[in-house]
Structure formats: structure tokens, C-alpha cells
């Protein structure tokens, strides 16, 4: 739970448990750059926020598919978790101490868009004036028909987006150079298929839930196909030859429905060694986000729900202008690992903010167990007012009150 550091760097550097790593800044040569025929000079930053974050090669190279994730995923919660969670998946195979991040450079927006399409029938190819080699959509064929609801059940849109991350390592032969050391892809899968009637494209939106087992089955099949396409790209395009021998990890992310206020989660990942066209065994992520308070929390995580409700009640008792307290917990298995709490309140002076923040910080220590991270964000109509961080086994939380 180090995400908060980047947002409050000036204050967070004082925390011993979250001290960044300072190393000598290196200027190195980047080999096998996908968009360049010649080697490029890049810089490895000397600043690493923590051992949970990758250093990014500089100058920052935007992905040729930059911005697509914003349009293709359902909610801002999913967008944030899909990108940050994919880095968490990468750590299973690529050590942040020795690997350096670069936004994906091999899959451009046209490629991703074509892969997100449905597969077309021969008749549809003729109708759209497309060549057979352009029929690369990973989503299933929709052959048409009058029963739109039945078609939605039988052939929903499973795949919503593909996100690529690249990871570089220093060359074993020459440490003044870095080479591509790994590619990580995230496949964002829909948990609900949204559609309109064919004859009323601007009419009401209908929903077709997709069973978890179906999401996983389809996602694994698509992941295997994507791996083979990456290897083929290396054979077809000399500028992408590095894809032939690089280790590849592909992870499946299940989106939440549009109306939810919690993010989706990664459900599994598989990897292929360099040069292999076959993914290995699938590994379950066993992660889940839970809203507090909620029926799910009450049913499955009663002790945590009770602690949260006691905290919520204390906040309501203390402050008459209270609006709401909402929490989002990240579970790995049955264990709560991280709890983020948002408290939006209208204040009428700095003294109120200070007093309320002190009270909340004290209640965190008294009411919640010590084994998980807690982050409390206190906001008003003016923006962020205070941030409270409590890490496992801390006797005192870190508190920052924003100056406005």
C-alpha cells in the first residue's frame, strides 16, 4: 500500500517505512526499440518510490495505443485498477529492482481495435468490403437474426480492451545497454454485455450478465491466440523481432458493471517463456474488492464490516455536517489487505478540519486491526482536505493536512 506516496511526495519522504530508493542515475542504450531501427539513449532514474514500483525509462515514450483504455472500460475505478493492477501482476515474474517500465510499444490503436472486433462471417466480409486477412476480431461472430436477446446470450462481447506494458533489463553482456526483458498484457473482460436493439441503436440499453466461468474460459482462449499473434508479429516485422524471444505474461481482468463504485479485479494470469508459443499453467489471483458498508461485506466479512460500521457511527456522532463514509477493501483470499475510506464533509474553518482529522486518526487506531493498510481521504467541496495513512503494526498513523 504505497500508492499514496506519489500524491503527497513532499510529506511522504519523511516516513521511514516508505523511504524511496536513491541510486545513481544511469544513461544507457536501449536496444531493440520497436519504432526505431537504430539504438536509442535512455535514462534510468535514480529515484524509486518503493520496491513495489518500477522505475520508468526516460524520456517517457507514450504508447501508440495511449488513451484507448479511457474509452473502452466502463468506469474510472476499472481504469485505475486495470493499469495499476497489471503492474502488480508483472511483479510475479519481473523484479522491480532489475526491470524498468516502458509503456507498451508493439500494439498500436489500429491493431488493438481490430482485435477487439467481432469475428466476421464470409457474408459480412463481403458486405464490409474486407479481406480475409483482416478478419482478426477476437470476439465471437454475431450472425444476426430477429431474436436480439438470444443472440446476446449466445455471443456477447467478452473482450473490452487490451493493455500492453513493456519491461527492460540491463544487458548481461554490456550493462551500458538495456534490452526488452518482458511483455505483460492485460485482457479486460466484460462481466455484463450491454446492447441495443438492431432497429433502435439509440434506444434503451439492455444488459446480459456473463457467468464467471464463461469469462474465464473465453479469456484463456483469447490469451493463447494473442500470444501466438505476438510471436507472428516478430516474424512479419523486423522492427518487432524482439517479440520472438521475450517472456510474455497475459492476465485476465474482470470489469465490474457500469453502476458499481468499486473496481473490478484480476482473476488470473499465465506466462510463456521466451520463444514459446504456448502459455503455461494459469495462476489464480484470488483478489476481490468489497464495498463498505454492503450486504456482501456483512455476509462474507462480518468482523471487518462491524469495525467499519463502528467507525462510521463515531464519525457521524462527532460531526453534524457529515455526509457519508464509504470504504473499499481489497481482499486476497479471505484476508483484508488494504482499506481505503472516503469521507466527504463540509467544513467551516481550518480548526474544524484539524480537529476532525485528529479525531478520525485516533479512531483508526482504536477500532481497526493492525494487520492491513488503511488510507483515509477527507474531502470537501474545495477539494482534498486531509490524508491519513496507517500501515500494518503502526502505533501512530501518518497525517497530512493540505494547505489551500
Identify what each model region corresponds to.
Residues 2-8:
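Sec-dependent signal peptide recognition
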Residues 13-17:
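C-terminal motif of bacterial Sec signal peptides marking the signal peptidase cleavage site
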Residues 19-22:
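Bacterial signal peptide processing site
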Residues 33-194, 214-222, 258-331:
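N-proximal, solvent-exposed amphipathic alpha-helical segments enriched in charged/polar residues
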Residues 178-184, 243-247, 336, 371-373:
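Extracytoplasmic
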Residues 201-217, 339-354:
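A short interface-forming secondary-structure element
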Residues 211-240, 351-373:
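Short, non-transmembrane amphipathic alpha-helical segments
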Residues 292-404:
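Hydrophilic extracytoplasmic domains
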Amino acid at each position: 500500500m504505497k500508492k499514496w506516496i506519489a500524491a503527497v511526495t513532499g510529506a511522504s519522504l519523511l516516513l521511514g517505512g516508505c523511504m524511496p530508493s536513491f541510486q545513481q542515475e544511469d544513461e544507457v542504450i536501449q536496444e531493440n526499440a520497436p519504432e526505431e531501427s537504430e539504438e536509442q539513449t535512455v535514462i534510468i532514474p535514480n529515484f524509486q518510490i518503493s520496491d513495489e514500483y518500477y522505475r520508468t525509462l526516460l524520456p517517457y515514450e507514450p504508447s501508440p495505443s495511449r488513451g484507448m483504455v479511457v474509452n473502452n472500460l466502463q468506469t474510472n475505478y476499472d481504469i485505475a485498477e486495470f493499469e495499476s493492477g497489471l503492474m502488480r501482476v508483472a511483479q510475479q515474474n519481473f523484479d522491480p529492482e532489475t526491470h524498468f517500465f516502458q509503456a507498451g510499444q508493439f500494439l498500436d490503436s489500429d491493431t488493438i481495435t481490430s482485435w477487439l472486433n467481432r469475428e466476421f462471417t464470409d457474408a459480412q466480409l463481403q458486405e464490409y468490403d474486407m479481406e480475409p486477412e483482416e478478419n482478426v476480431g477476437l470476439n465471437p461472430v454475431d450472425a444476426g437474426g430477429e431474436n436480439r436477446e438470444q443472440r446476446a446470450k449466445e455471443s456477447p462481447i467478452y473482450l473490452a480492451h487490451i493493455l500492453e506494458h513493456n519491461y527492460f533489463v540491463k544487458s548481461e553482456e554490456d550493462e551500458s545497454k538495456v534490452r526488452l526483458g518482458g511483455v505483460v498484457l492485460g485482457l479486460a473482460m466484460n462481466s455484463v454485455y450491454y446492447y441495443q436493439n438492431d432497429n433502435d441503436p439509440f434506444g434503451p440499453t439492455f444488459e446480459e450478465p456473463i457467468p464467471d466461468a464463461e469469462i474465464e474460459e473465453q479469456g484463456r482462449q483469447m490469451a493463447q491466440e494473442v500470444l501466438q499473434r505476438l510471436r507472428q508479429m516478430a516474424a512479419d516485422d523486423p522492427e518487432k523481432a524482439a517479440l520472438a524471444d521475450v517472456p510474455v505474461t497475459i492476465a485476465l481482468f474482470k470489469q465490474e458493471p457500469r453502476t458499481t463504485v468499486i473496481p473490478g479485479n484480476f482473476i488470473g494470469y499465465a506466462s510463456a517463456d521466451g520463444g514459446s508459443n504456448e502459455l503455461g499453467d494459469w495462476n489464480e489471483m484470488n483478489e476481490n474488492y468489497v464495498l463498505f458498508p454492503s450486504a456482501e461485506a456483512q455476509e462474507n466479512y462480518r468482523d471487518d464490516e462491524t469495525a467499519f460500521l463502528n467507525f462510521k457511527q463515531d464519525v457521524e456522532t462527532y460531526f453534524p455536517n457529515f455526509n457519508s463514509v464509504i470504504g473499499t477493501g481489497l481482499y486476497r483470499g479471505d484476508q483484508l489487505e488494504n482499506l481505503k475510506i472516503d469521507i466527504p464533509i463540509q467544513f467551516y474553518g481550518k480548526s474544524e478540519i484539524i480537529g476532525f482529522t485528529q479525531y478520525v486518526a485516533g479512531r483508526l487506531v482504536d477500532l481497526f486491526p493492525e494487520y492491513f493498510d488503511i488510507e483515509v481521504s477527507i474531502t470537501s467541496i474545495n477539494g482534498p482536505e486531509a490524508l491519513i495513512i496507517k500501515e500494518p503494526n503502526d502505533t501512530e498513523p501518518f497525517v497530512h493536512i493540505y494547505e489551500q
